[in-house]
């Protein structure tokens, strides 16, 4: 039963949600800072933190698992060679979400920025 099991659907099918998370995660890893709606970034945060924890292990199985979650070789290379060593001494909490003013001319969406903690 699905009692009290909640997740954001973003008016998308399951495949579209997976594609959205992969796309946002790829952009965050490559550019290290992205702007989007607050709800999307709150859903993205655990996905990216799981990838960084995998990258900190650094073995072949972790690399293959990360490639299955995020099939982009350039992003995985940066994740394992640049980001994982940066967060070696940190146990979680690799990202920060900073709220921005709402989008005024359109739908008044709550915007935010997600970035890596230095």
UniProtKB/Swiss-Prot annotation:
What Pfam families does its record include? Ribosomal_L17
Q: What's the superkingdom here?
A: Bacteria
Disulfide bond entries: none
What keywords sit in the KW lines?
A: Ribonucleoprotein, Ribosomal protein
One GO term in the molecular function aspect is: structural constituent of ribosome
Q: Which residues cross the membrane?
A: none
Q: Which Gene3D superfamilies match?
A: Ribosomal protein L17 (3.90.1030.10)
Gene Ontology CC entries for this record: cytosolic large ribosomal subunit
* Signal peptide (UniProt feature, chain positions): none
Q: Which GO biological-process labels does this protein carry?
A: translation
Please indicate if the UniProt record lists Cytoplasm as a keyword. Answer: no
What NCBIfam families does the database record attribute to this sequence? L17
Oligomer and partners: Part of the 50S ribosomal subunit. Contacts protein L32.
Per the record, the similarity remark reads: Belongs to the bacterial ribosomal protein bL17 family.
The record's annotation in PANTHER family points to:
LARGE RIBOSOMAL SUBUNIT PROTEIN BL17M, RIBOSOMAL PROTEIN L17
Q: What is this protein called?
A: Large ribosomal subunit protein bL17
Could you tell me the gene encoding this protein?
Answer: rplQ
């Amino acid at each position: 039963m699905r009692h009290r099991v909640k997740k954001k659907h973003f008016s998308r099918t399951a495949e579209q949600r997976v594609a959205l998370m992969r796309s946002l995660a790829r952009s965050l890893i490559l550019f290290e800072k992205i702007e989007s709606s607050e709800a999307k970034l709150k859903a993205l945060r655990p996905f990216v933190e799981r990838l960084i924890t995998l990258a900190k292990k650094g073995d072949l199985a972790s690399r293959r698992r990360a490639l299955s979650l995020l099939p982009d070789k350039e992003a995985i290379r940066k994740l394992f060679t640049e980001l994982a060593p940066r967060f070696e001494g940190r146990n979680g909490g690799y990202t920060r979400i900073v709220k921005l003013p709402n989008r005024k001319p359109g739908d008044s969406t709550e915007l935010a920025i997600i970035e890596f903690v230095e």
